[in-house]
Amino acid sequence: MNLVFLSNWERTETWIAAGRELERRGHRAFFVVTRDEHRRKALAAGFGPDRVLWLTRQGARAADTGASLSALERLEAAAGIRVSDMILMDRFLRSERQDWALRYAAYVHAALAAFIERHDIGLAVGQPDNVPDLLAEALVKARGGRYAAPFEFRMPTRRFMLWDSRLEARPHITGAATPGETTAEELEEARALRDRVTRGTKMRQVEARTAPPAIGAGFLKRLARGFLHRALIVSRHDVYMYTLRSALLDLRYHMTPINHRRLARIWDRLFEQPQAGERFVFYALNYAPEHTLDVEAPAFVSTFDVVRNIARSLPLGVRLYVKEHPTGIGLRGPAELERIKRLPGVRLIDPWVDSHALIQAADLTVSLSGTVSLEAAMYGRQAAILSDIFITGFSTCRRLNAPWEVGAALEAPPLEHRPDDDLRYLAWLISNSHPGTVIEPLVDPSSLEPENVSLIADAIGKVIDQASASSTPTTRRSPA
């Protein structure tokens, strides 16, 4: 099968390595990139220029987008998508001028449609939080193909999932077809994994970041690379690279170690400790911007409005405990957190307070799409979530449509905890997950080791086998 890897960030090296491994297994790999560095690495790995689609700012400026806009309208009608929705999900493109964002989307659509059609792409693999990825999902599916979104399994284990859409809702079925078909070994693994969660163990990437970010040689190196090279040079051709303005004001990832220390006294004044004997709803803020918020809960990206609407729904005598994401301190400024703290009934809890202790004491744990609701379900505690993702499959997790429904959920009869059903559901997720990691090499260099690359290729190969077995044709022309 012909497959395409889409990437605009640091996973690209992993995709190139996995593509080479899949080529050795008889498949043909193609790439869509936005950075010259990644294009050169794909070429150096032996993939010819015809195998790599490079999307650039210059290409969008030069493109005649009249016909492309008409084609986008046809795709919207055929696939039930909205391009404006995609632009707003895209943390980089939504900060651009509206006319430029639409021009870039039209250019990307035309280039992708031609590339996918020319190479008869049957599977697209990528990170669905940007316009090229979201359009590729729609285009490939429109011609009968598949889309796979690799994400770390949100449990304390070295496994990952291949979801079948932009949402972490349904995995590609490469193991047990239903929870009732899981094996005794998978059930035992699920039991052990649940026990690890209820002992307080976190996901690997969260557990590795339990201390405030350090300002040292590594930080200074990243700062120099970001400000002096990427922001000033790479951003000239790559839409998906922060500029100086966005690094300082919008996507403030580089600023978190500085802000964490610069504002230390303010944090001490803002944050509170839980109060013994107090009834409360626990709401954990998402790391932002991130896929779990931008794509899986796009209607609720305004943190203040979400907290205000939860708070106004709660009865007297029940507090709302709001806890900042511990790795996100410095992304949200003190002014925003101060506004949240001043809302009636709200306590802004110290980010370093143990979330598991709060989960076990809370009347209800709420998140937009966060792992904290999954952890609450592992304890059999009442939970709520505002997105259509896999966490709603656990017995004590309630799907809400809006923040102001939290109060009604709190007063509703509690959902029955069905531990055996939950265990089978977790075993089913494990059965359809894969060993290895898809974390960026900058975070986990072992992701590029041959053994892990082989595991990624194994997982994608299973999806290809599944697609081939279903004999779904991929030669139907797309509505482009």
For the regions a language model picked out, list residue spans one by one:
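Active-site donor-nucleotide binding/catalytic segment of nucleotide-sugar enzymes
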Residues: Q275-A311, E324-T327, S431, P435
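Conserved nucleotide-sugar donor-interacting segment of glycosyltransferase catalytic cores
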Residues: A110-I173
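Conserved N-terminal ligand/cofactor-binding loop architecture of enzyme catalytic domains
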Residues: E21-L112, E152-R261
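Catalytic donor nucleotide-activated moiety binding site of glycosyltransferases and closely related
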Residues: M89, S95, V307-D350
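Short loop/turn segments at strand-loop or loop-helix junctions that form parts
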Residues: T34, R57, E152, E278-E290, ...
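Nucleotide-activated donor-dependent transferases that construct or modify glycoconjugates
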Residues: M1-E10, R35, V125, L285-A288
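A donor-sugar binding/catalytic signature common to diverse glycosyltransferases
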Residues: A124-P128, F151, P351-R398
